[in-house]
Amino acid sequence: MSKLKELPLSALQFYATAPYACSYLDGRLARSQVATPAHLINADVYSKLVRAGFRRSGIFTYRPHCDDCHACTPCRVVVDQYSPSRAQRRAAERHQGLEALVAPLTYVEEHYQLYLLYQSVRHAGGGMDHDSRDQYEQFLLQSRVNSRLVEFREPPESPSAGKLRMVSMIDVLEDGLSSVYTFYDPIEQKASYGTYNVLWQIAQAQALDLPYVYLGYWIEQSRKMAYKALFQPLELLVNGEWRRFEDVVPRTTEE
């Protein structure tokens, strides 16, 4: 069930926000459709909302609802058919030694400092590079659904033993994992932490016998979001139906 009217969510209400500056496409205005009240959105309800194209930021559950733009397309990797590209295999080999620790959503000062470093280097001037601790916690550590925090560190035998390299927030859904947000050490120029994180989530979904990894929105015109098409096979939510990427976007995305 993908269409909102088909979902058993009669207790929820949905409203459209006022226009605001789009964070993905310069010069565009965006709007969101927000699901309320937040306390009714438990793990089961949220799983259904994600299948209908919603995402969350803290306890704020939304999906794009723009007046004249449909660039944001929900996407998910088909786990049991996933086949890594050559570049993805290299990323897996490069970072396979990282040790992953799965934990509840918890504030750790070291995580927060890495988050600030990541924002200042990768998204300078984007408005999040000076987030306070409260803003960080509201964005990433508040959740009413089945959420996990995963930290990735260098192994004991590494010259940088124990060094924190990456932190990822993940939601566990009925039919998959949903990648909420990931930040990593931006100083390592040759690293492929972001790619490795998606590969790790795909492997976890396979181990849990979950069919999908939801990657949020694919935006062809946005360099920050277009990379998701590199993880194939990918499905896109178009007009309420999940369809294969190649059926919607016939040309091949360059790696």
Curated annotation (Swiss-Prot):
Top-level taxon: Bacteria
Enzyme class: transferase
Alphabetized InterPro entries for the sequence: Acyl_CoA_acyltransferase (IPR016181), Asp_Glu_LeuTrfase (IPR017138), N-end_Aminoacyl_Trfase (IPR030700), N-end_Aminoacyl_Trfase_C (IPR007472), N-end_Aminoacyl_Trfase_N (IPR007471)
GO BP terms in the entry: ubiquitin-dependent protein catabolic process via the N-end rule pathway
GO molecular function: arginyl-tRNA--protein transferase activity; leucyl-tRNA--protein transferase activity
Predominant place of localization: cytoplasm
Keywords: Acyltransferase, Cytoplasm, Transferase
The keyword Amino-acid biosynthesis appears for this protein: no
Catalytically driven reaction(s): N-terminal L-glutamyl-[protein] + L-leucyl-tRNA(Leu) = N-terminal L-leucyl-L-glutamyl-[protein] + tRNA(Leu) + H(+); N-terminal L-aspartyl-[protein] + L-leucyl-tRNA(Leu) = N-terminal L-leucyl-L-aspartyl-[protein] + tRNA(Leu) + H(+)
EC numbers: 2.3.2.29
Subcellular location: Cytoplasm
Gene Ontology cellular component annotations, sorted alphabetically: cytoplasm
Purpose of the protein: Functions in the N-end rule pathway of protein degradation where it conjugates Leu from its aminoacyl-tRNA to the N-termini of proteins containing an N-terminal aspartate or glutamate.
Matching HAMAP family: Bpt (MF_00689)
Similarity-based family: Belongs to the R-transferase family. Bpt subfamily.
Protein name: Aspartate/glutamate leucyltransferase
Origin species: Ralstonia pickettii (strain 12J)
Source lineage: Bacteria, Pseudomonadati, Pseudomonadota, Betaproteobacteria, Burkholderiales
